[in-house]
């Protein structure tokens, strides 16, 4: 699935739509350059899950846990991870194989420990189409999501 957005609000809204469709136990990987809108998208996912607290990138903490929504939301940013042992120290498997949903930024750095069934989300800019243009590509096991028309 490919979604084009033309403003941060549209990127947020698409994230919210994903969050509304998310099911317990799903693991999403989120790929995109710095400043592409990963945090805005993630904030939308959180709102779609009914999370009421502020959502920010966990760059320095590796994981932020949110429990105020309809299911737990675990937001990982593994950009600064030194090695897989750091993931083991935080008990990643409890999150990846639990009843909440995980969204993992920079997941390519920990590919060897990702579950087999993931949903990959890539956000790309194209300045020729406008400063706020984003191409959001969702691939993987889309049948996990109850996709509906907007």
Task: Go through each PLM region and give its residues.
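Conserved lysine of the Walker
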Residues: 38
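Phosphate-binding P-loop
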Residues: 18-25
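Short phosphate-coordinating micro-motif centered on Lys-Gly-acidic
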Residues: 1, 85-87, 93-150
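N-terminal pre-Walker A segment at the start of P-loop NTPase domains
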Residues: 1-17
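Hydrophobic anchor at the beta1->P-loop junction of P-loop NTPases
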Residues: 28-30
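Short beta-strand-centered segment that lines the nucleotide-binding/catalytic pocket of NTP-utilizing
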Residues: 51-66
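The conserved Walker
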Residues: 34
């Amino acid at each position: 699935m490919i979604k084009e957005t033309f403003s941060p609000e549209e990127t947020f809204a698409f994230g919210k739509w994903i969050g509304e469709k998310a099911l317990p136990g799903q693991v999403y990987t989120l790929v995109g350059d710095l400043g592409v809108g990963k945090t805005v998208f993630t904030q939308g996912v959180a709102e779609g899950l009914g999370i009421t607290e502020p959502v920010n990138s966990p760059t320095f903490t590796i994981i932020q846990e949110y429990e105020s929504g309809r299911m737990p939301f675990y937001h990982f940013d593994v950009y600064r991870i030194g090695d897989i042992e750091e993931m083991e120290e935080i008990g990643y498997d409890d999150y990846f194989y639990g009843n909440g949903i995980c969204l993992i930024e920079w997941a390519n750095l920990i590919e060897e420990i990702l579950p087999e069934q993931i949903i990959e989300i890539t956000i790309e800019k194209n300045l020729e189409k406008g400063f706020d243009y984003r191409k959001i590509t969702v691939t993987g096991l889309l049948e996990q999501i109850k996709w509906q028309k907007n």
